[in-house]
Design a protein with these regions (language model features):
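Composition-driven recognition of glycine/serine/threonine/acidic- and proline-rich low-complexity segments
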Residues: 2-26, 30-214
Length: 214
């Protein structure tokens, strides 16, 4: 498989496309969060599979991880990472819970985290499909009961040449004027990256031809 080469301009374009999608996701999340929500993509990087596994494994002991796979024309996944503090605050705001016990998660709380992941991933995927004219969808989110590395290996085994393009998404959640950040990881495999680059490059060529013909 060819090694993808991404220029700085193309990185910026991909980040901007994702930011447009995340803006819609933030609006959807704000409805249940009952406050302002800001989502943005602060970083984009190509990383090796082993590094991806290490990256998500370090969160396992301190965060509840919700996974949603992206399927169709693109192949990837989103991981939302919730700490005990995040879960406590979201439970109070969205479920009107009082005296939330940290470290113990009820069925209702898990359903809330799944719904938040579903809203954000669903809105993001819909916008990406519209912008990139592609047929993609998000699978129902799940909270892996085994190690997240094992859950991700299911994807990696199916795609042995998987060299993920990883986006770290900063979810900034404002509650009572206090800003809380929820980490979210979004990654695509190499094939998907090549498809996205091809769409961007084709659009750039078409735009250039239109300008020259005017």
């Amino acid at each position: 498989m060819m090694e993808p080469h991404v220029t700085e301009l193309e990185r910026d374009i991909i980040k901007e496309i994702l930011n447009i999608g995340l803006a819609r996701a933030a609006d959807s999340f704000a409805v249940i969060a009952k406050d302002r929500v800001l989502l943005k993509v602060p970083d984009i990087q190509l990383i090796e599979v082993k590094d991806l596994i290490q990256l998500v494994t370090k969160y396992e002991d301190t965060h509840v991880i919700i996974q949603s796979d992206i399927k169709g024309d693109f192949n990837g996944a989103t991981l939302m990472l919730f700490s005990d503090d995040h879960i406590k605050m979201l439970s109070e705001v969205c479920l009107n819970m009082v005296e939330v016990q940290q470290g113990v998660m009820s069925v209702m709380q898990e359903s809330l985290l799944l719904e938040i992941s579903n809203i954000i991933t669903g809105a993001l995927v819909t916008q990406l499909a519209n912008i990139l004219k592609s047929s993609i969808y998000g699978s129902p989110p799940k909270a892996p009961k085994n190690h997240i590395a094992e859950s991700l290996k299911d994807i990696l085994v199916q795609h042995p040449l998987f060299q993920p393009l990883v986006f770290t998404v900063l979810t900034q959640f404002t509650h009572n004027s206090k800003k809380v950040e929820l980490p979210l990881l979004l990654f695509f495999d190499t094939n998907t990256l090549l498809k996205i680059l091809d769409i961007i490059r084709t659009f750039s060529i078409d735009k250039k031809n239109m300008m020259e013909s005017d």
